[in-house]
Amino acid sequence: MSDIRHALLRRDPLSAAKEVLYHLDISLGSALQSSAGPPAGLEKSTVELVEEFIFHVSKDRNIQSKRMSCVQELQLLEIICSYFQEQSKDAIRQVIFSALFSLQGNKADESRMAMLGKLVSMSIAVCRVPILECAAIWLQRTHSAWCVRLAQVLMEDYCTLVPCAISTLQNICSASPRFCCQLITAVTALYDFSTDELTPPPALLEMLVGWITEDPRLLLLTFINSPLNSSLPLGCLEITPLLGLLRWCVKAPLAYHRGRKSAMTNGHGDGEKGTAYEELYSKLHLSVLQVFLMLQVHLTEKNMFCRLTVLPVESVAALIEEVGRLCEKLAPLLDASHIQLALDRLAQALQVAMATGALLCAREDLRALCSRLPHNNLLQLVMSGPVVQPPPHSSPFQPNMYPHIHPGRPSPLSPHSPHQSTLSSPHSPHTVLTAHPTHPALAPHRPLTAHATHPALSPHAFHPASIAFPYRPIR
């Protein structure tokens, strides 16, 4: 390997980089064909060649690395794009891509990320699907912090620097849906609504909603194509973008109202745009709920229903806790309807996720978490669980009861409530009248005589809606 290095040192930077690519193709391709699977790892000498002659980070501090000019760097990107486009074997492409851009935990990682961001951005512009497919696998196996950095580079190129370039990114969905699925996951991890800068740009939001409404199965693409028993590396992105999109939908009513309030303070309020954002998030929320239903079908077909978690309980608990803090912090500044909208979306998502098997969590545990949230009628019903059916011999008009999720507040529907009364059936031929302090007791089992002179009762006379129940709805 030292002979190869000395030969490469005599070449110009661009020629040396091409020679390293050729060397990787020969050595890793041969190793892949001779073994049953991909090589476990690269030799240290091979890694050093890649770092020194492609990313220009020399292992020898005494030797000044040859830096490429901007034109040479662009030429190198074209060479890499052409190599992956011409390589017909997907397994070899994946191995070479991993050899180039797998992070090693050293000073060369910054150069790797810089080159990777430019390569993926260029591949989107010229639609190099093989590189986008390799980048999708990279996003699936790499720590989320690096994935977020790559997503940030792409968002700056296609949403910030050249806003009209978003249409180029939008067209990639049909060419490489796997890459788009992973990009959505990375983008939802990038934009967490903590600041105005970390709020999804309108063009990005509109593009993602268009992708998902056109084909909601896009969100499950990585999950469906991954082995069910496979374990992801520690710290990597979620297996689906569902949790990240759910976080967007729940936090959007709070964050966007904050943004509009700031804009109106500065005299730049735009109500029409705010309404458009709200509609986009409503569409996105509906699509997420629909994907949960699709997920249930897939889990049932694979005999993994209620056996494989898709939404980690820890992540859902963190979201609930975060929403609680935001509601408490922003309550004096927000209209109550915005907080209720956020809680409504959270309640709907939790109910559908539990019903479809995406969230495996005891309802009692969720009830304890949600008890810290502001009161919300829908969340109250969801966390209370199924309706408690009355005993078979009780009154037909006795209301069903829900246990309250706020333990410090007694439920008005408690069976021990002093306002609870029992109604006897109006159709019983022998009505038992109980004793009353101001009236004489009637003989037991005294049949009531028919009143022929009275007009016939309306068929709706004993409809439950016509009876005033002694309880109030949950508020």
Curated annotation (Swiss-Prot):
GO terms for cellular component: chromosome; INTAC complex; integrator complex; nucleus
Family: Belongs to the Integrator subunit 15 family.
Disulfide links within the chain: none
Entry protein name: Integrator complex subunit 15
GO BP term (any one): RNA polymerase II transcription initiation surveillance
Biased composition (Low complexity): 416-430
Organism phylogeny: Eukaryota, Metazoa, Chordata, Craniata, Vertebrata
Function statement: Component of the integrator complex, a multiprotein complex that terminates RNA polymerase II (Pol II) transcription in the promoter-proximal region of genes.
Cellular localisation: Nucleus; Chromosome
Keyword tags: Chromosome, Nucleus
Subunit structure: Component of the Integrator complex, composed of core subunits INTS1, INTS2, INTS3, INTS4, INTS5, INTS6, INTS7, INTS8, INTS9/RC74, INTS10, INTS11/CPSF3L, INTS12, INTS13, INTS14 and INTS15. The core complex associates with protein phosphatase 2A subunits PPP2CA and PPP2R1A, to form the Integrator-PP2A (INTAC) complex. INTS15 is part of the tail subcomplex, composed of INTS10, INTS13, INTS14 and INTS15.
Superkingdom of the source species: Eukaryota
Nucleus found in the keyword field: yes
Region annotation Disordered: where it falls in the sequence: 402-444
